[in-house]
Amino acid sequence: MAALQEKKTCGQRMEEFQRYCWNPDTGQMLGRTLSRWVWISLYYVAFYVVMTGLFALCLYVLMQTVDPYTPDYQDQLRSPGVTLRPDVYGEKGLEIVYNVSDNRTWADLTQTLHAFLAGYSPAAQEDSINCTSEQYFFQESFRAPNHTKFSCKFTADMLQNCSGLADPNFGFEEGKPCFIIKMNRIVKFLPSNGSAPRVDCAFLDQPRELGQPLQVKYYPPNGTFSLHYFPYYGKKAQPHYSNPLVAAKLLNIPRNAEVAIVCKVMAEHVTFNNPHDPYEGKVEFKLKIEK
């Protein structure tokens, strides 16, 4: 039977550990001599330098295949989303309630519109160009300053009676409010095969007390988004791009009754029946005007 090994004392263990850390007989530190530590350190330095260089080279080659003028992330929706101004969200979506006799109930709404349209002032649009072609504005090269592409102007005065210039209250005071409709941007999206997309607003459910459909006055006329604002080439290619707008002035909203309204963008390549996204191609909101 093998003899049992003698159990080492604490002092012996400490002595062995000290000799492992530094052995004066062999000149080893942590099991290696100084020269071996130098060589192994140089090996790992060279190894990680080479690995870092290879990684940087692969990353550089990959970045050369990426177009800097194409967004890194894009939505999978086929059609752009549609937004509304002023945008007041309640528990069940967009809900706008105000009293024509109390300006405190609609002052914030008009201020929201003024703040939004500040980006469409002549000063804010001075870097864009005037476009009148009413056709798609294709740009294959970067002919604008700083290696960019031109953007077409859209100024607030194009919204005429809903611009906030002639009527700073946007019709809220008289119970005929203006709402501004905007399509979200999709790079290189073409809304139709040649006809300008237009906005069409209607009651979701016809109010019983109103025997006629929703009456709307659109600005610009016919409620169209001119084709020369398309296609959009991205934020880097068109840093001064502004979304075109359509204003809808609602003329026959009944008093003291909540009505549901939907505004759709009518175009060949715009869909508005996506059950998973209620804002694709259209915007729905509830409106109640009290007196």
Curated annotation (Swiss-Prot):
InterPro entries: Na/K_ATPase_sub_beta, Na/K_ATPase_sub_beta_sf
PANTHER family linked to this entry: POTASSIUM-TRANSPORTING ATPASE SUBUNIT BETA, SODIUM/POTASSIUM-DEPENDENT ATPASE BETA SUBUNIT
Subunit structure: The ATPase pump is composed of two subunits: alpha (catalytic) and beta (regulatory). Interacts with alpha subunit ATP12A; this interaction is required for the formation of a functionally active pump and targeting at the plasma membrane. Interacts (via N-terminus) with alpha subunit ATP4A (via the P-domain).
Keyword Repressor belongs to the record: no
Topology class, membrane: Single-pass type II membrane protein
Cytoplasmic-facing ranges: 1-36
Annotated organism of origin: Homo sapiens (Human)
Keyword Nuclease among record annotations: no
Protein role: The beta subunit of the gastric H(+)/K(+) ATPase pump which transports H(+) ions in exchange for K(+) ions across the apical membrane of parietal cells. Plays a structural and regulatory role in the assembly and membrane targeting of a functionally active pump. Within a transport cycle, the transfer of a H(+) ion across the membrane is coupled to ATP hydrolysis and is associated with a transient phosphorylation of the alpha subunit that shifts the pump conformation from inward-facing (E1) to outward-facing state (E2).
Location relative to the cell: Apical cell membrane; Cell membrane
Domain notes from UniProt: The C-terminal lobe folds into an immunoglobulin-like domain and mediates cell adhesion properties.
Glycosylated residue positions: 99, 103, 130, 146, 161, 193, 222
GO molecular function terms noted in the UniProt entry: ATPase activator activity; heterocyclic compound binding; P-type potassium:proton transporter activity
Protein name: Potassium-transporting ATPase subunit beta
Residues in the Extracellular compartment per record: 58-291
GO cellular component, one term: plasma membrane
Gene Ontology biological-process annotations: cell adhesion; intracellular potassium ion homeostasis; intracellular sodium ion homeostasis; pH reduction; potassium ion import across plasma membrane; potassium ion transmembrane transport; response to lipopolysaccharide; sodium ion export across plasma membrane
UniProt-annotated stretches for the region immunoglobulin-like: 194-291
Transmembrane segments: 37-57
Cysteine-cysteine disulfides: 131-152, 162-178, 201-263
Record-stated family: Belongs to the X(+)/potassium ATPases subunit beta family.
Keywords: Cell adhesion, Cell membrane, Disulfide bond, Glycoprotein, Hydrogen ion transport, Ion transport, Membrane, Potassium, Potassium transport, Signal-anchor, Transmembrane, Transmembrane helix, Transport
